[in-house]
Regions:
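N-terminal glycine-rich, Lys/His-bearing helix-loop that initiates the first secondary-structure elements
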Residues: 1-78, 410-412, 417-423
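PLP-dependent enzyme catalytic core of the Aspartate aminotransferase-like
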Residues: 2-14, 81, 292-293, 353-423
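Short acidic (Asp/Glu) and glycine-rich catalytic loops that position anionic groups and cofactors
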Residues: 23-29, 54-61, 169, 248-253, ...
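Flexible, glycine/charged-enriched surface loops at secondary-structure junctions
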Residues: 30, 61-62, 91, 262-265, ...
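Conserved PLP-enzyme active-site core in the AAT-like
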Residues: 74, 78, 82-305
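A glycine-rich phosphate-binding loop feature that marks nucleotide/adenosyl-phosphate handling sites
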Residues: 272, 289-295, 311-321, 352-354, ...
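Conserved PLP-binding catalytic core of the aspartate aminotransferase-like
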Residues: 307-372
Length: 423
């Protein structure tokens, strides 16, 4: 049963209540290994569903366009200060609705339409908003893209440097959605300084690892840092932009009134709660456990003959190239889902297949680490993944059904925030 209980939803709209309950049960029974997902705490859930959703608060604390802000202002001020303290930055804006609007606000702060911007190619591991052609950022601006080395699968910093010198972009983005290795922020900072670019570190995927000391911080190297507040940070669906003091005013004006109206106050409160949780010692333990689990899982998959992009991982994310297995990422992901293991199909660098039917799988360990799984469980997880993929190639539903039952049996012993099993 969903926790907290939802009796009022059940009374008003049983159809939606049933779907919420079904989703809660699904999340409880699955090895949720999509790298961009996690579980939030009950405290974050409660803040997200509070009466703060009733309030409108255009502007910033002390400078609002609506009355009745005497409790909203301190909530946002607390959230901002906690972000500043946790990440060690000069300034933080907690109002962006999500990661894409946060990145768009950065463009608004520093670029004009037609300006050159630089980011990692999406098929190589970047993000849509770093200038990819189907995104508004690739239509309004002139994107140039860097990638990874064919021989190592790692970021090609020589290419980054050469492109930056040649193209002189206004912004250089570092970070992405499928980068399994540590990002070299000092090297990016050196390139940005040489070419006069604003360096933006998009740490949406690794923010929790940075906060917990399990990944190097971009603070002191990047001019601006954007991040979602979910993923490894275990907060609500929101975002933050952090910056040096020099850029604080430009960022704030870009978010409001440049891009958004009123912030979502219930989300701001939930961000504040999540940031307090992330400052606790047990969160640091959690962040390091994510990396330990990823490395253990990567080693177990490698032992079973799987090819990992870059040869392994330094963070929460593993990218498998299934080309040697002669199965596409989409059918593999669907088979795994039926077996109780939730991942997403993903392009791999230099993929010869189409994006909607790529060669890879993207796997993350954030959620299963929140549930309490450790390194000792990773060989079994790898075995289930391997068996499921092999069964998919043989259309062996019996094997997949057996594994789904074993996954449910394992997870019954690991509590999930937001769900209470029925006796």
């Amino acid at each position: 049963m969903h926790q907290p209980p939802i009796p009022h939803v059940a009374s008003t709209d049983p159809q939606i209540a049933d779907l919420i309950q079904a989703e809660a049960k699904r999340q409880f029974e699955k090895l949720r290994m999509i790298a961009s997902e996690n579980y939030v705490s009950l405290a974050v859930l409660e803040a997200s569903g509070s009466v703060l959703t009733n309030k409108y608060s255009e502007g910033y604390p002390g400078r609002r366009y609506y009355e009745g802000q005497q409790f909203i202002d301190p909530i946002e001020t607390i959230a901002v200060q906690r972000a500043v303290d946790l990440f060690g930055v000069d300034h933080a804006n907690v109002q962006p609705y999500s990661g894409s609007p946060a990145n768009l606000a950065v463009y608004l702060a520093f670029c004009s339409p037609g300006d050159t911007v630089m980011g990692m190619s999406l098929p190589m591991g970047g993000h849509l908003t770093h200038g990819w052609s189907v995104s508004v950022t690739g239509k309004w601006f002139r994107p140039v893209r860097y990638g990874v080395r064919a021989d190592t699968g790692r970021l090609d910093l020589d290419e980054v440097r050469d492109l930056a010198r040649k193209e002189r972009p206004k912004i250089i983005f570092c970070g992405g959605t499928a980068i399994p290795r540590t990002i070299d922020f000092p090297a990016f900072a050196e390139i940005a300084a040489e070419t006069g670019a604003v360096l933006v570190a998009d740490i949406a995927h690794i923010a929790g690892l940075v906060a917990g000391g399990a990944h190097p911080s971009p603070v002191g190297y990047a001019d601006v840092i954007t991040t979602t507040t979910h993923k490894t940070l275990r907060g609500p669906r929101g975002a933050m932009i952090m910056s040096t003091a020099e850029h604080a005013s430009a960022i704030d004006k870009a978010v409001f009134p440049g891009l958004q109206g009123g912030p979502h106050d219930h989300t701001t409160a939930a961000i504040a709660v999540a940031l307090k949780e992330a400052a606790a010692p047990d969160f640091r333990t959690y962040a390091h456990q994510i990396v330990a689990n990823s490395r253990a899982l990567a080693a177990a998959l490698t032992e079973r003959g799987y090819s990992l992009v870059s040869g392994g991982t330094d963070n929460h994310l593993i990218l498998i190239d299934l080309t040697p297995q002669e199965i596409g990422g989409k059918p593999a992901a669907r088979a795994l889902d039926r077996a109780g293991i939730e991942v997403n199909y993903n392009t791999v660098p230099f993929d010869t297949r189409k994006p909607f039917d790529p060669s890879g799988l993207r796997i993350g360990t954030s959620s299963i680490t929140t549930r309490g799984l450790t390194e000792q469980h990773m060989p079994q997880v790898a075995a289930w993944m391997d068996e499921s993929i092999r069964a998919a190639t043989k259309q062996d539903d019996a094997v997949i059904d057996r594994i789904a039952g074993q996954v449910r049996e394992l997870l019954a012993g690991f509590p999930m925030p937001g769900f209470a099993p029925q006796p």
